[in-house]
């Protein structure tokens, strides 16, 4: 890009050509880095000042016919590139804006679905009163059943205690009968011993009787032998007596002896028979007595055995009844414990479902609140984009094409400042229109910032700690942007002051080119430039000071 400077303090004029590349200044955080904007707008004041200055040098403009047309073509191509980039960036912004709108519609649809789900959950949460009544009714019925089972259990326990008392009585009677049986068995043993002794005595007496009978038989035999011997002797004596008449008569002596022995034998036999009869009678009586006692003992033992077996059967029956009652009680306890465990599990499940429902409802409410916050943030972002788009449309209504700065210098060396390169639209327009554009843009920025701050204040009420941190971060980012803007303006001011000191006077602002670029669809690439000088730097300083004051106020906010 070429620029020309004019110095009226020298007698001769000299053309000074300065080549400079277009500068890019990105002020918005949401545009692509390749975007460059500029708005070379020409005001009526600039036109008047340029007419005044160009009237003196109109005679010299005919000498610039030899200007390099390639530079003009380069400027036109640069302007085309810039316009193409602006168009592409606008299309990109439109696409992003459409995507944001689609996202907002999608979030609205999801919001409606979540509201419907929340309404259903609230209805479900309000309905469980009837379900609670049903559960309470079932719990009451189960408690009544439990109380009935408890009463039955108490009755069974009382019956069990009664049977245990009866069992204890029967056990006492059984022990008494066992003692009586032991006594009877002891007496039976005694009787058996006596019977055995009697049997032994009888056997002994029988043996003695046999021995006595043998002795009697032996004595009879001996007596018979003696009698036969005596008879033979008597006969021999008679014979001898007959033979010998003079021999004495011994028959009388023998008869006496025989009579004595017979008396003695009869007496012994009679005494033995009497003793035997008396002993036999005694033994017979004793045996009869023992037999009666044994029979009575046997009868008593059999009766005791019968009673013992009967009592044993009764005890077994009582034990069976007791076991059956214990099993029934155990079954009832197990059944009741199972029912109680089932009811407890059901209650735990219901409580768990209630907790899950509450947690799910809380989660849905949190998601709904998050979606509301996202929606609010998107609404704020959409409002900010709308404000930015409106400001962009307002700026584009004043946009131009480019600027060609021309002029002549004296033949002597000139230390003039080079032409301004293409800068951002906001910066160039603020310099070209210090009275209108700066105030207008600042008002729009303040309105946008006030809208954003009010929306952030509402978000801060909903999301206290986290949103406050985000606000602080965003304010710091905005402060950084403001500092960058102030730094750039400060640098430009320093450059101007340095150039003004080199020239030794207050210079007017250099002219800006206004170019009109036709649409690329028509394929036209013509560019027309008109150079005009701006007002003096003194008219721009109050606007810059006012913008700095507003930025300081914004930082304080």
UniProtKB/Swiss-Prot annotation:
Keywords: Acetylation, Cell projection, Coiled coil, Cytoplasm, Cytoskeleton, Intermediate filament. It comes from the Eukaryota. Residues 277-392 are annotated as: Coil 2B. Residues 249-267 are annotated as: Coil 2A. Residues 453-464, 539-548 have a biased composition (Basic and acidic residues). The modification N-acetylserine is found at residue 2. Residues 86-396 form the IF rod domain. Residues 393-437 are annotated as: Tail, subdomain A. It holds the Pfam family Filament. Residues 452-557 are annotated as: Disordered. Residues 90-121 are annotated as: Coil 1A. Its main location: other. PROSITE patterns: IF_ROD_1 (PS00226), IF_ROD_2 (PS51842). Residues 268-276 are annotated as: Linker 2. Residues 2-89 are annotated as: Head. Residues 465-538 have a biased composition (Acidic residues). Residues 135-230 are annotated as: Coil 1B. InterPro entries: IF_conserved (IPR018039), IF_rod_dom (IPR039008), Intermed_filament_DNA-bd (IPR006821), Intermediate_filament (IPR050405). Residues 393-557 are annotated as: Tail. Residues 438-557 are annotated as: Tail, subdomain B (acidic). Residues 122-134 are annotated as: Linker 1. Belongs to the intermediate filament family. Neurofilaments usually contain three intermediate filament proteins: NEFL, NEFM, and NEFH which are involved in the maintenance of neuronal caliber. May additionally cooperate with other neuronal intermediate filament proteins to form neuronal filamentous networks. NF-L is the most abundant of the three neurofilament proteins and, as the other nonepithelial intermediate filament proteins, it can form homomeric 10-nm filaments. This is Neurofilament light polypeptide. It comes from Xenopus tropicalis. The gene is nefl.
